[in-house]
Design a protein with these regions (language model features):
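Charge-dense, low-complexity intrinsically disordered segments
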Residues: 1-8, 94-98, 102
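Small/polar-rich, solvent-exposed N-terminal microdomains that initiate assembly or binding
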Residues: 1-59, 123-127
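Acidic-leaning, charged glycine-interspersed low-complexity segments
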Residues: 37-42, 97-163
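Amphipathic alpha-helical interaction segments
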Residues: 52-55, 73-76, 118, 122
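Short conserved micro-motifs at the rims of enzyme active sites and ligand-binding pockets
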Residues: 58, 76-79, 171-173
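Oligomerization/assembly interface segments of phage tail-like spikes and tubes
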Residues: 58-74, 87, 151-166
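A solvent-exposed, charged loop/short amphipathic helix patch at secondary-structure junctions
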Residues: 74-100
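A hydrophobic membrane-anchoring alpha-helix module
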Residues: 156-182
Length: 182
């Protein structure tokens, strides 16, 4: 018998994964435009936007859009690093935007890796690392964004499908015993 995973199970697992990552300081769920970045004080932020659920013969795929972002700081007194003097064409402003892109991309790849490899799930209470409860497949397109919001903020966004088993059993559906046919 399959222990079907619900939307809450999947979402709470993603949030728990974010909580255990030492660089992620805040999490949120919902429409990305509902985030009030002016009130947010702790970054890096991982935001989960649920997009859809698709069914297979014996599985559900919960689809999410995941944002990993941090604040960009600009200071008038900053000077360019002499080690990067050859890369001045790449660095147009005196800010930490390049570092933010670098760090948030690493967090994104960490997050994908935790879902691709069941070892992480084993550390979180699953006895057999060969029996993942949640997993993902396919390749991912990770897209950068910057200044998408009111604050100077940048990071990466990607779409991910979380596959879980579901046996679509009909024995415990809360309906009356009578048939539905006329």
């Amino acid at each position: 018998m399959v222990n079907n995973k619900t939307y809450n199970n999947v979402l709470n697992t993603l949030l728990r994964m974010a909580e255990t990552h030492s660089q992620i300081k805040s999490t949120s769920v919902g429409d990305i435009f509902d985030i009030n970045l002016e009130k947010m004080q702790k970054f890096v932020l991982l935001h989960i936007n649920p997009t859809s659920v698709t069914t297979g013969d014996s599985q559900l795929t919960y689809n999410f859009q995941i944002f990993v972002m941090d604040m960009v700081t600009e200071k008038a007194g900053w000077t360019k690093n002499n080690q990067n003097a050859n890369f001045t064409k790449l660095v147009k402003t005196l800010s930490n935007e390049q570092d933010v892109f670098n760090e948030t991309l690493q967090i994104v790849t960490d997050f994908i890796g935790m879902l691709r490899h069941s070892t992480r799930q084993s550390l979180n209470g699953v006895d057999d690392i060969n029996f993942p409860l949640y997993f993902t497949q396919d390749q991912f397109t990770i897209e950068p964004f910057s200044e998408r919001f009111d604050n100077l903020c940048c990071g990466w966004v990607f779409n991910i499908g979380i596959l879980v088993q579901n046996d679509f059993q009909t024995c415990e559906i809360p309906v009356s015993i009578r048939g539905a046919g006329y």
